[in-house]
Structures are given as C-alpha cells and as structure tokens.
Amino acid sequence: TKHRDGYRPETERFRWDSRDQLTGYCSAQGELWEYRHDASGRRTEKRCDRKKIRFTYLWDGDSIAEIREYRDDELYSVRHLVFNGFELISQQFSRVRQPHPSVAPQWVTRTNHAVSDLTGRPLMLFNSEGKTVWRPGQTSLWGLALSLPADTDDPDPRGELDPEADPGLLYAGQWRDAESGLCYNRFRYYEPESGMYLVSDPLGLQGGEQTYRYVPNPLRWIDPLGLNKGASLSKMMNSSSDLMGLRRQPQNFWRLYRGKDI
C-alpha cells in the first residue's frame, strides 16, 4: 500500500505473489490492473477490465519483441521491436484506422529507427526520411518524469511528433507502466520516484549488499534484468545467467564499456 497525505489523500494498492511478481495494482481512482507472467517470470499480459484495455507481450529471450494492444476485445495496435542486446534499434508500429464509418478499417504501419545514449536509453526515433517523430520528455537523473514529451526545450509547434511512436522504455530493459508510474524491469519493478526497486534482489546478497538499490549512476551503469548492476553488458548478462541457471549469452553480445571509461 502506498499512501499520500494532503487535502485529498490518495491510496494505491499493490498485490504481489510468492515470487515477488506484481499481479495486481489498484490506482487511487479505483482502476484495477491485472498482470500475468509465464513460467520464466516474464510478463505476458496486463489488463484493466474497467477501461476494457489489454496488452499482450511476445518475448525473444529476455527482450520484448512484440506488444499487442486490445480495446473492447478487438485488436487495436501491434508494436514490433528490434533490439541489439537491450538497445532499441528500430520499431514497427501498426494501428487500425477508420477515417469514416462508410470506409472499411485499414491497418496503417510506420517503421521508425532509434538513437540511444551510451546506456541504451532511447533519445529519439526518426522515420525513413530522417525526421524526428518522437523524443522523451525531461526526467530526473533517476527517471522521474518532469515534463511531457512535447513539453521540452525544443517544442513541437507544428505537431510533427507522434505520441504513438513512444516505445515505452526508460532505461535499458525498463518498461514504463503509465497506470502506476513504475517500470517493469524483468525480475523486479523499479520506482523512478525513489530511484529504488520495490522488492529485494532475487539473487539475495549475491547481487550486492544493498538489495533494493538500482545502480550507482544511471548515466554509466545499467541493470536490464533487475538482478545486478553492470558496466559490461555481456559480462553482466553471463554473470546473472550463471546465478539463475540460464543459458549464457554469446561472446559477441552487445557490449557496454565500464562506466569509468565512458
């Protein structure tokens, strides 16, 4: 339970299972969201029956490859994502459109490519013509939103940015949940407001002495699985895989150099 005091106090409720996976969230407005996971702990679905919205997730290893959105039990959009490790390379977004009731619905597809910083965080998306179609809003060092995507130092007076192009990523491996403000980080949930994880590290003390800590510096370090911080992504992935009993990553896996060398 998360409670905020004030003139209009608010209470948010979270439900966790025995594996410390978030299975339910109730907002201060009474919206109930349900989350489902597969046997490997990967999120496969989130839904809100009150809003008649449902998202399904298709995985490629530990990276999300496809997100489908359903509204009123009908497929509304499909987002395909291509990663180099945990760095977004490109995405293809398709949505059904019906400009007029007399016209049959048609699927419209747009392909965009990403530019990321040294940690793999998306900085912008551009189309095949080289025009910027999306960029993130301002955030604090730990990812807390300080502005909307269109409310930045470089405004969008012509309305050229596309909100639907937002891939939904914060830091490497972190997927933003608009309903709760949390970020789904594979094995755990990250809270940008505090810069901490909500549950203890599944690795215990093997992941570090501070089991709720994210990373020392998000500008130099990443934790795409929510297990342990790392500067060399391939080394970190193999270390986490060994501890969890999973298959090791290949030697040419996407690599990020040590933070002190960046």
Residue ranges and their predicted role:
Residues T1-T111, V133, L148-P167:
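Acidic/glycine-rich beta-solenoid
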Residues F14, Y35, F55-Y57, H80-L81, ...:
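A residue-level detector for well-ordered beta-strand positions
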Residues L144-L148, T152, R188-L198, P202, ...:
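Short, low-complexity export/processing leader segments characterized by acidic and small residues
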Residues G230-I262:
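Catalytic toxin/effector domains delivered as secreted proteins or via bacterial secretion systems
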